[in-house]
Regions:
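Extracellular, repeat-based ectodomains that mediate carbohydrate processing or recognition
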Residues: 15-430
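Bacterial N-terminal signal peptides
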Residues: 1-11
């Protein structure tokens, strides 16, 4: 555990809309904070997990990046100093954190370490004070993009290796795992995990993007939802949508597929399955955000619905979705609709791009939606945050959760480009 260190409490100079709090920076204020994951329990505690790029005070054996845990005991009003999750002596990547929806108490976390060749699971039953650790899967090959889902004694850790999607399943609360291949008939290109969830009946679901061209995240993208009703032993997948090739973001130093099609899942208390994803119709062109739902375990899905009010041509990415009781579904994403009026006369392809985080909610399963709320706002003192928005998303995903009071919490990354500098921010509201 870290000793006393400075951690950020900077808040927005301009007040956020009344439905959401002003954004506050969380985590260490030195180095870079990247792609956070978020969870909330039934007692007012909020948990955020993120990889920290830079020196960690008080931890001589920490490598870059190091997985840091943030805990709030008062529904996000204040945060404890960041603490090191596990001193492994290797870099730690791709944070995942979840609270068991069956008891709303037990906390699980996961990440990659040992040169991304181990998938680590952590479990806590005392509000994150102490943890037990298990290596769920170990391999000679490099893994990517773990997705964590839990319910009761069922724990699923999905991950991908090039074109293959795998899952490690446990039926004893994460103590022992059995791996299984999910997509036996994969496409030639990479498969990238997006999300995992377990419904109230115990069915497990995974969502991933699969690229058509060999050797990377290239070509058109199939978006899949896979289902297992036998504790992860076998899987059946359905194509939810097909997207054109991913937009190019080499100017921001990002890797292949960073802004490509992505899909996220949630299940409500009545077993309704919800999906939110980004997809485009023109190769390397802008993508938008779509929503659909299924009331029969993913067998049939309603026609997709565009849920962003941004004008055509606006780039969208990084869908996030959570669901509560019957019909309660909440969604968020990032897009580039904001522009600088000073550049109005310049060619469109030469104007600076600005990103913001947006949120909507529905109380009737997506039949109707609330107005959009811009969650991210200007904060002075950061070279990558302007009055129009932040310069680039900082992380492959961001986190969202519903707390014990029914409020939504969002934690996301803002940066200058894909590399550095960047930080993570928290806001909450309805």
């Amino acid at each position: 555990m870290l000793g006393p260190v400075a951690f950020a409490l900077a808040s927005a100079a301009w007040a956020a809309p009344p439905q959401f709090s002003a954004q506050k920076r969380v985590g260490l204020t030195t180095g870079d904070q990247w792609e956070p994951s978020l969870a909330a329990d039934g007692s007012g505690r909020i948990y955020a997990l993120y990889p920290h790029y830079g020196e960690v005070p008080g931890c001589k054996d920490c490598r870059i990046p190091t997985m840091l845990l943030l805990i709030s005991n008062d529904d996000g009003k204040t945060w404890q100093p960041p603490r090191v999750m596990f001193e492994s002596g290797s870099g730690q990547f791709d944070a995942q954190i979840a609270v068991d929806p069956a008891d709303r108490h037990t906390v699980f976390a996961a990440w990659l370490e040992n040169r991304k060749r181990e998938v680590m699971l952590a479990r806590s039953s005392d509000f994150g004070a102490t943890w037990s650790f298990t290596v769920a899967v170990r391999s000679d090959e490099e893994f990517d993009k773990p997705a964590l889902a839990v319910r009761g004694q069922n724990v699923y850790l999905a991950f991908n290796h090039e074109e293959e999607v795998w899952v490690a399943a446990s039926q004893d609360g994460g103590r022992n795992f059995t791996p299984a291949r999910v997509n036996a008939d994969s496409r030639p290109g990479w498969s990238l995990l997006g999300s995992a969830v377990v419904d109230p009946s115990g069915n497990a679901y995974l969502a991933w993007a699969s690229y058509s061209k060999a050797g990377g995240a290239r070509g058109s993208v199939n978006l899949y939802v896979g289902k297992s009703s036998d504790s992860g032993k076998t899987w059946a997948a359905k194509t939810i949508d097909v997207s054109a090739a991913a937009p190019d973001c080499k100017d921001e130093d990002c890797g292949e597929g960073y802004l490509g099609a992505q899909i996220s899942l949630a299940s409500s208390s009545d077993g309704t399955l919800y999906a939110l994803w980004s997809a485009g119709r023109t190769a390397m062109g802008p993508e938008t955000i779509y929503f659909s739902s299924s009331t029969n375990g993913g067998e049939n899905w309603l026609p997709r619905e565009s849920v962003s009010s941004a004008q055509p041509g606006v780039e969208h990415a990084f869908p996030a979705i959570v669901a509560g009781h019957n019909g309660d579904v909440r969604i968020a994403w990032m897009d580039t609709r904001m522009t600088d009026p000073k550049t109005a006369g310049e060619p469109e392809d030469s104007r600076p791009t600005y990103w913001n985080t947006y949120y909507r909610s529905s109380s009737n399963g997506g039949a109707t939606w609330s107005d959009e709320i811009q969650v991210s706002h200007y904060v002075p003192g950061f070279s990558y945050i302007t009055e129009q928005g932040f310069r680039f998303p900082f992380g492959d995903y961001f986190g969202m959760a519903i707390d014990n009071l029914g409020d939504t919490h969002i934690v996301w990354g803002e940066g200058l480009n894909y590399q550095s500098p960047g930080s993570i921010w928290h806001a909450s509201g309805r």
